[in-house]
């Protein structure tokens, strides 16, 4: 099995520290707001990885933390006039509901930062004792970045370049502008915990170093997260953990790709920011999961109406193949399983694995017509391999009937109307072209004109 390692910037043969057992830590969310579609990407990617490793016979200890104390949490609780614990419990429950709808299995352990403050304080003290950290005059404790020789190895950054590009610090308590906070002194009225340096709360980076090593040991197999965490969060985790323990922190670093919306970066300022629950109000959960798996986990995903329509149509093809066949385990001679494993063993290439499943679905459709006796075994194979990805778990009839009412006319008729509109536009008969567009819009079919022609989506799909 080959996995791309962000640290070495290449694919490597994956060999767990303990034969047959994988210890994996993934950075979870800061629970001050609802999860967005970018969080869903990370959740689904590492759920897929966990499912596949277990299917291949590994025992997986999957740990994903919860950051339940942070500046953003304090600010949101104050804005809401809500106790911090009430806010975080509400958001944790919402996260579990969202990921459950997406078919994401719960991690084995979900450590919370507030439950590990003693471990965090102990790690900070160890770093001070070793000369890697220092208490400052303002009550904060900072990490000495230049003291750690390997700083920048994950993000491939040079310290001097970082120093040259850093802004002038208003806070003069640091020895060096590159130093980052491990422990924040509490302001009056803020949530805080006692420490040798005064009441305060942990910095974000040290939380993950302490929780991951407490749960999985000083060195473990896989550390994952979103693409925005490579620097500074994961870079700082390495610096903290390896300085504290004197050992390599993580063998394989994995990062999921970003989610873009209509080819733009997702952000609240652009108005293209979507929470998972907003997305699931308009789209079936399995359609969203399929979209998130249709590309390689490291590739960026474009979240757009036509991409969701493609995902729905792909699922309909699979469920159409499975419809009317009772799956029964049996021999399937065409090597689909071997091809599926080869794709997934190549850095969890779900795009290639789904291509294999499309071939299997085509053979199942042929067997239903030409060799019905072979269909049950093929259906079983398709259900099992799809299940490894967390797909095809619904009753085919139910899935197809749920989507049947969405199209007010056949796809062939829609395409014919689009072609008639194109001909009208070519003849400069814009009244007819606009009339066709309006006619389809009245039926809930939205046309999108692009450089490569016209595509269509069902409104609200």
UniProtKB/Swiss-Prot annotation:
Transmembrane segments: none annotated. It is found in: Cytoplasm. It catalyses: tRNA(Cys) + L-cysteine + ATP = L-cysteinyl-tRNA(Cys) + AMP + diphosphate. Its EC number is 6.1.1.16. InterPro entries: Cys-tRNA-ligase (IPR015803), Cys-tRNA-synt_Ia_DALR (IPR015273), Cys-tRNA/MSH_ligase (IPR024909), CysS_C (IPR056411), Rossmann-like_a/b/a_fold (IPR014729), tRNA-synt_1_cat_dom (IPR032678), tRNAsynth_Ia_anticodon-bd (IPR009080). Keywords: Aminoacyl-tRNA synthetase, ATP-binding, Cytoplasm, Ligase, Metal-binding, Nucleotide-binding, Protein biosynthesis, Zinc. A motif ('HIGH' region) lies at residues 29-39. Pfam families: CysS_C (PF23493), DALR_2 (PF09190), tRNA-synt_1e (PF01406). This is Cysteine--tRNA ligase.
């Amino acid at each position: 099995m080959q996995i791309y390692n962000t640290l070495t910037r290449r694919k490597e043969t994956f060999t767990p520290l303990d034969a047959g057992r994988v210890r994996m830590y993934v950075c979870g969310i800061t629970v001050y707001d609802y999860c967005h579609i970018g969080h869903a990407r990370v959740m689904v990617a590492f759920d897929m990885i966990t499912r596949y490793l277990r299917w291949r016979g590994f025992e997986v200890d999957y740990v994903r933390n919860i950051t339940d104390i942070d500046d953003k949490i304090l600010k949101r609780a104050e804005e809401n006039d809500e106790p911090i614990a009430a806010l975080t419990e509400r958001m944790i429950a919402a996260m579990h509901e969202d990921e459950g709808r997406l078919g994401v299995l719960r991690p084995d352990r979900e450590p919370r930062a507030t439950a590990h403050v003693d471990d965090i304080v102990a790690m900070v003290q160890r770093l001070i004792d070793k000369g890697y950290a220092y208490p400052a005059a303002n009550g904060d404790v900072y990490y000495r970045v230049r003291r750690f020789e390997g700083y920048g190895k994950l993000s491939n950054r040079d310290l001097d370049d970082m120093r040259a590009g850093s802004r002038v610090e208003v806070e003069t308590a640091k020895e060096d502008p590159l130093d980052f906070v491990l422990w924040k002194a509490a302001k009056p009225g803020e949530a805080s915990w006692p420490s040798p340096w005064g009441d305060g709360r942990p910095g974000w980076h040290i939380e993950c170093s302490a929780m991951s090593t407490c749960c999985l040991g000083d060195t473990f197999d896989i550390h994952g997260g979103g693409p925005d965490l490579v620097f500074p969060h994961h870079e700082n985790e390495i610096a903290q953990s390896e300085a504290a323990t004197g050992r390599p922190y993580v063998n394989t670093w994995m990062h999921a790709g970003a989610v873009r919306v209509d080819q733009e970066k997702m952000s609240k300022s652009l108005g293209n920011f979507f929470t998972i629950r907003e997305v699931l109000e308009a789209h079936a959960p399995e359609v969203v999961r399929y979209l998130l798996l249709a590309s390689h986990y490291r590739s960026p995903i474009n979240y757009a109406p036509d991409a969701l329509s493609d995902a729905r149509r792909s699922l309909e093809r699979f469920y159409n193949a499975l419809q009317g066949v009772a799956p029964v385990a049996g021999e399937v001679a065409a090597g689909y399983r071997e091809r599926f494993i080869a794709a997934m063993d190549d850095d969890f290439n779900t795009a290639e694995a789904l291509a294999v499943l499309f071939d299997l679905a085509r053979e199942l459709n042929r067997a239903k017509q030409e060799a019905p006796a072979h269909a049950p075994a093929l259906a079983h194979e398709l259900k099992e391999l799809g299940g490894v990805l967390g797909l095809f778990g619904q009753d085919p009839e139910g899935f197809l009937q749920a989507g049947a009412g969405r199209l007010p006319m056949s796809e062939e008729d829609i395409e014919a109307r689009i072609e008639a509109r194109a001909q009208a536009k070519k003849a400069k008969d814009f009244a007819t072209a606009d009339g066709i567009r309006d006619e389809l819009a009245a039926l809930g079919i939205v046309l999108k004109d692009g450089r490569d022609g016209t595509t269509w989506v069902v409104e609200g799909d």
